[in-house]
Curated annotation (Swiss-Prot):
Pathway(s) per entry: Protein biosynthesis; polypeptide chain elongation
Name of this protein: Elongation factor P
MF terms (GO), sorted A to Z: translation elongation factor activity
Function, as annotated: Involved in peptide bond synthesis. Stimulates efficient translation and peptide-bond synthesis on native or reconstituted 70S ribosomes in vitro. Probably functions indirectly by altering the affinity of the ribosome for aminoacyl-tRNA, thus increasing their reactivity as acceptors for peptidyl transferase.
Subcellular location: Cytoplasm
UniProt-listed CDD domains: S1_EF-P_repeat_1
Upper lineage: Bacteria, Pseudomonadati, Pseudomonadota, Alphaproteobacteria, Rickettsiales
Disulfide bonds: none
Protein source organism: Rickettsia rickettsii (strain Sheila Smith)
Keyword list, A-Z: Cytoplasm, Elongation factor, Protein biosynthesis
């Protein structure tokens, strides 16, 4: 499917120079004083992992990879792989832990994730937008602390460090965004 350079977004997977590239940063739209407008795009090659900056004219059209998305349930770790099961057909697949990188610590047993495939090859794992985790370490509650904008550091059960409001204590469950690893709210 062709998309205009102005429509490129972070996370898009493009077919460029016969390779698959994922857009890794928000594209910068620039309108110089002289010359035509262009879009500066930082991309990462999905095969080699190399990064590249490309400049496309606003009038350019690029090929967006058509991906098939399926729901999978995470079962367990096997060496350097994740073992996941298709929720519809119950087929199991192994995928390298490297595909999740720093978000690996959010993965919990039986979690449902979305896997994007291109020509039956897994390219990307998408976690749920938020997860509920327990606070395992933080400073004690300060008397009189209210839900103001003052935050303290906390370490969650999976080892991730986040800033939480002063009134939260060890053992409480909180909602955390998986994309930027930030506190959302106390779990209900």
């Amino acid at each position: 499917m062709k998309i205009s350079a102005n429509s490129i977004r972070t996370g898009n997977i493009l077919v460029y120079n016969n390779d698959l590239w994922v857009v890794s940063k928000t594209p910068e739209h620039t309108q110089p004083g002289k010359g035509g407008a262009y879009v500066q795009v930082e991309m990462k090659n999905l095969k080699t992992g190399t990064k590249r900056n490309e400049r496309f004219s606003s009038a350019d059209y690029l090929e967006k990879a058509e991906l098939e998305q399926k729901d999978y349930q995470f079962l367990y770790f096997e060496g350097d792989d994740l073992v996941l099961m298709d929720t519809k057909h119950f087929d199991q697949i192994n995928i390298s832990k490297e595909m999740l990188e720093e978000k690996l610590s959010f993965l919990t047993e039986n979690m449902i994730v979305k896997i994007e495939f291109y020509n039956d090859k897994p390219l990307n794992i998408e976690l749920p937008p938020t997860v509920i985790l327990e606070i395992s370490e933080t400073d004690p509650v300060i008397k009189g602390a209210t839900a103001t904008a003052s935050y303290k550091p906390a370490i969650l059960e999976n080892g991730i460090k986040v800033k939480v409001p002063q009134y939260l204590e060890i053992g409480e469950k909180i909602v955390v965004k998986t994309d930027d690893m930030t506190y959302v709210e106390r779990a209900k």
